[in-house]
A protein has these predicted regions:
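Helix-loop-beta element that forms the nucleotide-linked donor phosphate-binding surface
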Residues: 140-157
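N-terminal subdomain of nucleotide-sugar transferases
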Residues: 1-25, 30-37, 67, 131
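A short beta-strand/loop micro-motif in the catalytic core of glycosyltransferases
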Residues: 128-136
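An amphipathic, basic-hydrophobic alpha-helix
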Residues: 45-72, 81-82, 86, 116-120, ...
């Protein structure tokens, strides 16, 4: 869904930047308005798992600064929205304001979000986003029933 949205906006003349660890499979071409920025995740010997969320936030900061982006539109509350919130905070220390739109797709709420370990991060990421959208009314209801969400969630089916 995110890839198709980006490609459609690019056709209308908007510059679209995909920031992720792998080029989206549906993004089988790049054009003058479509860009892909790879997130390079390095192993950190102290930890068993690479710090993807930190690498993603750092890459978001770099791309926002270099490309002068107007906004970050992220898909999924974790890890993308939480990484975007961290990037926004880092950018604020540099005098850069970047709004965040978070689109909820389902598994970030109904599967990952139900894990008690992640609940506070999901709640924080959603509430700190400037705009929140969901792909269905049922997902909007589930989000409000599972988390203490203070933000309006707009449904875009």
């Amino acid at each position: 869904m995110a890839t198709e949205l980006g490609m459609g906006l690019a056709k209308k003349g908007h510059q679209i930047h995909f920031i992720t660890y792998a080029q989206p499979t549906r993004l089988d071409f790049l054009s003058e308005n479509l860009f892909y920025h790879e997130v390079s995740v390095k192993d950190y010997p102290l930890f068993d798992y690479p710090p993807y969320e930190i690498a993603l936030a750092a890459r978001m900061v770099d791309v926002v600064e270099f490309e002068k982006l107007d906004l970050l539109h992220v898909h999924y509350a974790i890890p993308h929205a939480s990484a975007a919130i961290l990037a926004k905070q880092i950018l604020a220390t540099k005098g850069i304001t970047i709004p965040i739109i978070t689109t909820l797709h389902g598994t970030d709420i109904t599967l990952v979000g139900k894990e008690a370990t992640y609940a506070s991060v999901v709640t924080y990421a959603i509430n700190q986003s400037d705009v929140v959208t969901a792909v269905s009314n049922s997902l909007k209801r589930d989000t409000h029933s599972l988390f203490d969400i203070q933000k309006e969630i707009k449904v875009i089916p």
